[in-house]
From Swiss-Prot:
Pfam families: SpoVG. It comes from Fusobacterium nucleatum subsp. nucleatum (strain ATCC 25586 / DSM 15643 / BCRC 10681 / CIP 101130 / JCM 8532 / KCTC 2640 / LMG 13131 / VPI 4355). It comes from the Bacteria. Transmembrane segments: none annotated. The keyword rRNA-binding does not apply. This is Putative septation protein SpoVG. The lineage of its organism: Bacteria, Fusobacteriati, Fusobacteriota, Fusobacteriia, Fusobacteriales. GO terms for biological process: division septum assembly; sporulation resulting in formation of a cellular spore. PANTHER family: SEPTATION PROTEIN SPOVG-RELATED. Gene3D superfamilies: Stage V sporulation protein G. Keywords: Cell cycle, Cell division, Septation. Could be involved in septation.
């Protein structure tokens, strides 16, 4: 599967500690996954899959890639798009 479209909604860094953006990803122009999050971790940015809080207060992914290659592709494309938005905004200012 290939990432064919990415939509990013940046969030205010002052209001959210680690959250950088909400993300929607389209795969093969056939499947859209809403509710991904671009997070800042101790070892860099990563994409958190959509999740639901369970009764025991634990979070479970609603959807997630089974193969690491797809997860890496999603992360790479999302980060590239996020940083491209940063550069576009800096050019406008």
């Amino acid at each position: 599967m290939k990432v064919t479209n990415v939509k990013i909604k940046k969030v205010d860094g002052d209001k959210f500690d680690r959250l950088r953006a909400y993300v929607d990803v389209t795969l093969d122009d056939c499947l859209v996954i809403h509710g991904l999050k671009l997070m800042q971790g101790e070892q860099g940015m990563f994409v958190a899959m959509p999740s639901r809080k369970m009764r025991n207060e634990e979070f479970k992914d609603i959807v997630h890639p089974i193969c690491p290659e797809l997860r890496n592709d999603i992360t790479k494309v999302v980060q590239e798009k996020y940083f491209a938005l940063d550069q576009e905004q800096e050019a406008v200012i």
